[in-house]
Curated annotation (Swiss-Prot):
GO biological process: ribosomal small subunit assembly; translation
Organism of origin: Vitis vinifera
Family label: Belongs to the universal ribosomal protein uS2 family.
Keyword annotations of the record: Cytoplasm, Ribonucleoprotein, Ribosomal protein
Span of the signal peptide: none
Protein name per the record: Small ribosomal subunit protein uS2
Length: 312
């Protein structure tokens, strides 16, 4: 007689989900402060993270988040593109403030900035990528929760959740689990009940996917109801014989009256030039006739002053 299958607990279901999302895969390097969370090392050098400790750290982080009265005092930040959608979804369901993208230096330390804020808790995706907000949070005594891989630096990190923080499925799964735990502790979701929000909403999506789907659709050619392509079209023009002469076309030059030519002036020549008052004879027989020199103007005559002789 086969024994009935035992129903999995909530922790076992979460661990199976994290296995499917490859949360347990680390890197080939291991920080000395992350050795306590490593389960084993594979033959190819990849460190395997203990998902049991990951689940416990998620519970600890959820308790810290629930302990803050105003959710707007919590900042969830991710500079990594794979975590930006998950950060926005986490803030949507938990009420926290999300910062998706590059961190503006001085957000937590420079009071002259318009984006200055003093949060009570900071949640990050990667301590290596988000190193600037971690340093500023340390200067402002802000507790920090971060998802740490096996090679992540643990400096200034108060609660490090060991997990794969480089995969888009891993990051989405972690934020989904953390959001569900927070809602369960707030009694928004009844304990033991399934959350109706799918984990796929927290996954990163490629922005080119909708464009590719639109390009695959074949646009049908419009049907104008023409069945006989040899039929007469365009107001009587032959559809099949385009080279035939068109006899019915109006003659555009028939209605235009002929213009009589302008009569030439008798005895005139194009090369003739007007007579110039000059003593130098100028040849005016052809097209290469030279231009007339300027006319000399006599100097004014002043009484009592002799005219210039030209040597002055």
């Amino acid at each position: 007689m086969a024994t009935p299958t035992r129903a999995l607990s909530q922790k076992e279901q979460d661990i199976q989900m994290m296995l499917a999302a490859e949360v347990h895969l680390g890197t080939k390097n291991c920080n000395f402060q992350m050795e306590r969370y490593v389960f084993k090392r594979r033959n190819d050098g990849i460190y395997i993270i203990n998902l049991g400790k990951t689940w416990e750290k998620l519970q600890l982080a959820a308790r810290v988040i629930v302990a803050i009265e105003n959710p707007k005092d919590i900042i969830v930040q991710s500079a990594r593109p794979y975590g930006q959608r998950a950060v926005l979804k986490f803030a949507q369901y938990t009420g926290a403030h999300a910062i998706a993208g590059r961190h503006t230096p001085g957000t937590f330390t420079n009071q002259l900035q318009t984006s200055f804020s003093e949060p009570r808790l900071l949640i990050l995706t990667d301590p290596r990528t988000d190193h600037q907000p971690i340093k500023e949070a340390a200067l402002g005594n802000i507790p920090t929760i971060a998802f740490c891989d096996t090679d992540s630096p643990m400096r200034y990190v108060d609660i490090g959740i060991p997990a794969n923080n480089k995969g888009k499925h891993s990051i989405g799964c972690l934020f989904w689990l953390l959001a569900r735990m927070v809602l369960q502790m707030r009694r928004t979701i009844a304990p033991g009940h399934k959350w109706d929000v799918m984990v796929d909403l927290f996954f990163y999506r490629e922005p080119e996917e909708p464009k590719e789907q639109e390009g695959d659709e074949v646009v049908a050619a419009p049907d104008y109801g023409i069945t006989d392509y040899q039929a007469t079209a365009l107001g009587g023009l032959g559809g099949g014989d385009w080279g035939a002469p068109i006899t019915d076309a109006p003659q555009w030059g028939a209605d235009v009256p002929a213009v009589a030519p302008i009569p030439a002036v008798p005895g005139s020549n194009w090369g003739d030039a007007a007579p110039m008052p000059s003593a130098v004879p100028i040849a005016t027989d052809g097209w290469d006739a030279a231009a007339a020199p300027p006319v000399a103007v006599p100097p004014p005559v002043v009484e009592g002053v002799p005219p210039p002789a030209g040597w002055e």
